[in-house]
């Protein structure tokens, strides 16, 4: 929540949040994290974040329960009830693909927030520990995006 509230004013366009929840951890927090991301982001992209022994798709399904607000009354005591804000969302279980898509779809002024792994340099899937670095992937995708724009536009990024 604190990260999203801090990032929100930095986005001059949309706030796009890429995140997942770790496997073999507190399952009750997953829909709560989904709800918070949906409330404070304009777009949410769900992905893997160290699924460990759990199925990444099941983890994403649990997070998604918080993304869709439950049915609410339209009026209470004769007064309209304001709608619950809920972001558009997508899911890409492959973390690299999720980061690539978030950056590819970002418009000028948008802020892409890649949350969860931070300083970690690996992704744990089953009993395998695979090399994975959010920062390196984001830099690589941004460099490719800049290069493509220069080639298409013939000018600077």
In which residue ranges do the predicted regions lie?
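ATP-dependent carboxylate-amine ligase
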Residues: 1-157
């Amino acid at each position: 929540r604190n990260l999203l509230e801090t990032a929100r004013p930095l986005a001059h366009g949309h706030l796009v949040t890429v995140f997942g929840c770790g496997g073999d951890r507190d399952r009750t927090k997953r829909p709560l994290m989904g709800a918070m991301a949906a409330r404070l982001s304009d777009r949410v992209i769900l992905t893997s974040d160290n699924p460990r022994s759990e199925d990444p798709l099941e983890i994403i399904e649990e997070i998604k329960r918080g993304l869709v607000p439950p049915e609410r009354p339209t009026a209470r005591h004769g007064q309209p009830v304001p709608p619950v804000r809920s972001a558009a969302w997508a899911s890409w279980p492959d973390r690299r693909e999720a980061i690539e898509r978030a950056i590819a779809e970002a418009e000028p002024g948008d802020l892409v927030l890649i949350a969860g792994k931070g300083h970690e340099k690996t992704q744990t899937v089953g009993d395998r520990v695979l090399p994975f670095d959010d920062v390196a992937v984001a830099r690589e995708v941004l460099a490719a995006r800049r290069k493509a724009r220069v080639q298409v536009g013939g000018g600077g990024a």
